[in-house]
Amino acid sequence: MSQSADETPIEQVAPTPENIRQDAKVNFPVFLGSSVGILAIALWALISPTSAAEVLGVAVGAISKWFGWFYIALAAIILVFVFFLGFSRYGETRLGPPNSRPEFSTFSWASMLFAAGIGTDILFFSVAGPVSQYLHPPVGKGETVQAAREATVWTLFHYGITGWGMYALMGMALGYFAYRRKKPLSVRSALYPIFGDKLNGPLGHTVDGAAILGTIFGVATTLGIGVVQLNVGLEILFGIDQGIPAQVGLVILAVAMATASATTGIHKGIRFLSQLNVVLALFLAAWVFITGRTDFLLNAIVMNIGDFVWSFPRRALETFAYNDVSAWMSAWTLFFWAWWVAWASFVGMFLARISRGRTLREFVVGTMLIPFSYVLMWVAIFGNAAIDLIRSGDNSFAEATLKTPEMGFYLLLQQCPAAVFIMGLATFVGLLFYVTSADSGALIMANLSSFLPTVRSDAPGWLRIFWAGVTGLLTIGMLIVGGIPALQNATIIMGCLLYTSDA
């Protein structure tokens, strides 16, 4: 792919992070405070899983009852504000000096942008989400034509532009203050207009520590869902039993791969894995699309787009005040919004890190449209294919997916030609999704717990290895507590704390 004059790679115009990493120093107040807190939670989950599960359940119930409206309203407000910044006169402002240009080619930027914010979970929810909404919608009767139309759109909504608006707001704020105001590329810089130089002390350390807590729970949730999903693939392909031993092994393998990638920096490992991930994932989706009922899927995709656009304003502010669907809200909309918030510090900082030289308008359009275009394609293909399979009379697929959601994706792939090859490819793609999330998360958490001499600097390699390992330990702890539901509950709690503090 050729590059335009304003897309010269950073390697040609500036020192790489690897050349200046030796100047980075550990921020011990942030490092010790966040690591001790996370390790304490992980050990609590490992030592007393029953107690941890009970506390998580009670806390989530209270949050759903008293703060659900706040989640919904603030998410909508953030989205409107982001579009205003991007398409107003402020949209011409660059994330960098006025004469700066993008550091990465458009393809590299788009690949990293989408891979950092989308994880293995999209394999899980692209089938489990639509199937669940079709069989048991929040309101109305399931297994109807209306339920089929609503099912995929609900999943698109939960993975849609509302969440990316949270990422974009954080990324714009961090990028602006780092590149235009010469502040550190850390979460504390986003609060500089409010607190000023007070952020240079304990207050700033607390903000960055909270960002690390949110990041690690968000990433651990994605990784936990990922290893459960991958365990299914390994059982089908190689007969490896599902369970904690296999999942622990997958966590260790993925953390090792993520560590190797993260220690090479953005310009090498992370960029390469992101690009490879995009290509293989697109091939996988294209295979299902071409070998399946292509005519039906084309019609369904167009219909999904129309339904999504038409119903978006209603869904964005939907609290179901007149319906008793608190359990559904906790499991779906509130969980997803908390999940996006938990990831916002990490992804926003990462987006700012790779977006130097782009205008706010480019940034908003890119972050809102590029990942969602992929999500739309992926969810529409796999979600509609799954619903079509159920409506064609395959009740066993419906029952299995509802009972064991992580099975749904692979059961759908078993219907495709060359099923063994495609399931093997899907497992590898899932592993790459896992690694690109984990390596980016380890890099950002290491940077948040360091004093960096420049915005292009990265933390010492050992610190990235530490955070990759702690993320794996927390993932294992939450899986032992209760698997995916425990991870979801922990994310809702951390998301609520971050939501409230950010507001």
Where are these regions (language model features)?
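Membrane-interface helix-loop-helix modules in multi-pass membrane proteins
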Residues: 78, 82-85, 95-185, 365, ...
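Helix-loop-helix module between adjacent transmembrane segments
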Residues: 22-25, 29, 33-46, 79-82, ...
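Flexible loop linkers connecting adjacent transmembrane helices
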Residues: 15-21, 54-60, 88-106, 131-153, ...
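Membrane-helix boundary/coupling elements in multi-pass transport proteins
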Residues: 180-185, 214-231, 345-364, 420-449
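Conserved small/polar residues in nucleotide/adenosyl-binding loops
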Residues: 499-503
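Loop-to-transmembrane helix boundary motifs in multi-pass membrane proteins
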Residues: 23-38, 196-205, 240-259, 263, ...
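Extracellular/periplasmic helix-exit of transmembrane alpha-helices
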Residues: 125-137, 288-311, 319, 372-404
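Membrane-water interface regions at transmembrane-helix termini and the short interhelical loops
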Residues: 18-23, 49-63, 82-103, 153-157, ...
